[in-house]
């Protein structure tokens, strides 16, 4: 289920963006509207269903997720070119689906027995690395040579597999628990600065690499390379770069080097972004994506490690792990919401100065991420 979700996300994060740009004559506003509605709905969904997650019948919610996934792509198939006028509706349905998915499926993962989790994690990582390289080329080739509709047929196959899997899952080993207590958890955030800082790191993640940066990168790639095939090839190449960066991190990087790594990778990202803004060409696009692939990978791995360290603080692990991870997700999505609000402003930028001012805001987001990541790393060293 998780691998299929990741496969579909590759399509929506890159090739749906390309489709919107093609339909709107390279107007990025529909992309921004889609994501604003999507992340607003994710936040609302995760907040409103938080207590349903602690009841035993979560499998029903998981099946709703798969149904919404089908509705999302069915609308794309039915409306075709007119879907550009309903970007908000797609965002609404996509946000509802994703908010339910990450809320429910994270709990399923947390209930995997410890003896089996390493095997599960290893299999997922291997499959995820494989699809990150192969799937973009497949979608890019199909979209360029056969059209967007043929891509949707492939997606429908994945969705039907998800439907079958959802009826295999059962509510096993998921006992009823107490309701989520956000009021008490907020008091923990006020009293423990490290816990609060870990949430700010998640917020900064939403502002940058897991936010509008992904769409921004896609827009610039399309601006230069034009076709879905080129987008697919580049996405696959930089997936390989990401895998290489992960290998280096796992085998060569020591914990004492983390702060230097955060500073260096974020500094180089800013330099590469400025270069791409001032001179958008093949070389600046490749340079930025190369640097960003390393920076994003290192930031994610370092911050994920620190997030897990904080989750095992006595004040959290005894009673508030559910609240801790739920709020981390919410902070990420709040960051993404702000990030895409800034992204939407680019659609109204009618001169170079306006564009540059908005891009400076993204640079400030990167600097903020660097600062909070370093502070949390120092606390956990």
Regions found by a protein language model. Give the residues of each.
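Helix-to-loop junctions at the C-terminal end of transmembrane segments
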Residues: 45-58, 143, 245-257
């Amino acid at each position: 289920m998780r691998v299929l979700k990741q496969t579909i996300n590759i399509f929506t994060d890159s090739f749906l963006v390309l489709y919107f740009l093609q339909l709107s004559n390279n107007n990025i506003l529909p992309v921004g509207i889609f994501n604003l509605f999507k992340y607003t709905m994710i936040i609302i969904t995760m907040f409103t269903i938080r207590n349903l997650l602690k009841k035993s019948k979560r499998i029903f919610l998981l099946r709703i997720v798969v149904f919404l996934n089908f509705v999302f792509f069915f609308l794309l198939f039915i409306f075709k070119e007119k879907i550009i006028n309903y970007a908000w509706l797609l965002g609404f349905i996509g946000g509802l689906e994703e908010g339910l998915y990450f809320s429910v499926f994270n709990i399923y993962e947390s209930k995997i027995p410890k003896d089996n989790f390493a095997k599960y994690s290893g299999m997922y990582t291997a499959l995820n690395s494989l699809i990150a390289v192969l799937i973009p080329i497949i979608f890019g080739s199909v979209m360029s040579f056969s059209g967007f509709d043929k891509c949707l047929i492939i997606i429908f196959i994945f969705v039907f597999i998800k439907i079958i899997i959802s009826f295999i899952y059962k509510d096993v080993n998921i006992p009823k628990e107490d309701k989520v207590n956000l009021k008490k958890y907020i008091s923990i955030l006020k009293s423990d600065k490290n816990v609060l800082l870990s949430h700010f790191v998640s917020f900064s993640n939403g502002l940058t690499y897991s936010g509008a940066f992904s769409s921004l990168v896609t827009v610039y790639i399309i601006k230069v390379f034009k076709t879905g095939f080129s987008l697919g090839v580049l996405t696959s190449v930089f997936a390989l770069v990401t895998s290489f960066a992960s290998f280096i991190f796992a085998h060569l990087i020591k914990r004492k080097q983390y702060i230097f790594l955060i500073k260096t990778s974020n500094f180089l990202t800013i330099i590469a972004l400025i270069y791409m803004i001032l001179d958008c060409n093949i070389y600046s696009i490749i340079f930025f994506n190369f640097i960003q692939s390393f920076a994003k990978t290192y930031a994610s791995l370092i911050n994920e490690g620190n997030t897990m360290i904080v989750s095992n603080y006595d004040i959290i692990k005894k009673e508030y792990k559910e609240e801790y991870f739920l709020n981390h997700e919410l902070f990420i999505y709040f960051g993404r919401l702000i990030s895409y609000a800034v992204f939407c402003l680019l659609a109204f930028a009618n001169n170079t100065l306006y564009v540059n001012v908005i891009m400076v805001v993204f640079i400030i987001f990167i600097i903020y991420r660097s600062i909070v990541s370093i502070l949390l790393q120092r606390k956990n060293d």
